[in-house]
Amino acid sequence: MEHYLSLFIKSVFIENMALSFFLGMCTFLAVSKKVSTAFGLGVAVIFVLGLSVPVNQLVYSLLKDGAIVEGVDLTFLKFITFIGVIAALVQILEMFLDKFVPALYNALGIYLPLITVNCAIFGAVSFMAQREYNFGESVVYGFGAGLGWMLAIVALAGITEKMKYSDAPKGLKGLGITFIAAGLMAMAFMSFSGIQL
């Protein structure tokens, strides 16, 4: 149990996808203008990561040498299968949001289908395969990585909303000051890197 708790804390804070590995930055910066939209996208990322990492772990275990047929190694198919599973889960999420939460679906716009090619999603799945997590570890890691990404984007959206009323220099208004805020947040999250769990 302690191992899973440390893996969860590590995936949320120490190895934060957005602020430590700088993965998923296109949607991270583009959708961080309003807290409500950032929260909705964060929940969507938690859903996709929380499902795609464990599902891809099961698929990857079938691709390993001798898993299906003795002497047959299908690990060269891992990237294409990972992308297929992620795309299917994002499509299911998109249909669900369109049907039941149309306001969030419209607010996310093009960024919802872009979760399919979000490097934070693929990065978490690749880390799972590289680190050879078992199914339980992949569930904890996927949920923790999604929660960490959501924490980062909601925090940045809150800062961005407050900065609308600040007197920023003309050349830094908009994306410029957002980059500076994201960089300062990343520096703050680097303080967690010295923690050994």
From Swiss-Prot:
InterPro entries: NqrDE/RnfAE (IPR003667), NqrDE/RnfAE_oxidrdctase (IPR050133), NqrE (IPR010967). GO terms for cellular component: Gram-negative-bacterium-type cell wall; plasma membrane. It comes from the Bacteria. One of its GO terms (molecular function) is oxidoreductase activity, acting on NAD(P)H, quinone or similar compound as acceptor. Keywords: Cell inner membrane, Cell membrane, Ion transport, Membrane, NAD, Sodium, Sodium transport, Translocase, Transmembrane, Transmembrane helix, Transport, Ubiquinone. It is found in: Cell inner membrane. It is a multi-pass membrane protein. GO terms for biological process: respiratory electron transport chain; sodium ion transport. Its main location: membrane. It catalyses: a ubiquinone + n Na(+)(in) + NADH + H(+) = a ubiquinol + n Na(+)(out) + NAD(+). Its EC number is 7.2.1.1. Pfam families: Rnf-Nqr (PF02508). The chain crosses the membrane at residues 11-31, 35-55, 76-96, 108-128, 139-159, 175-195. Composed of six subunits; NqrA, NqrB, NqrC, NqrD, NqrE and NqrF. NQR complex catalyzes the reduction of ubiquinone-1 to ubiquinol by two successive reactions, coupled with the transport of Na(+) ions from the cytoplasm to the periplasm. NqrA to NqrE are probably involved in the second step, the conversion of ubisemiquinone to ubiquinol. Belongs to the NqrDE/RnfAE family. NCBIfam families: nqrE (TIGR01940). This is Na(+)-translocating NADH-quinone reductase subunit E. It comes from Neisseria meningitidis serogroup C / serotype 2a (strain ATCC 700532 / DSM 15464 / FAM18). The gene is nqrE.
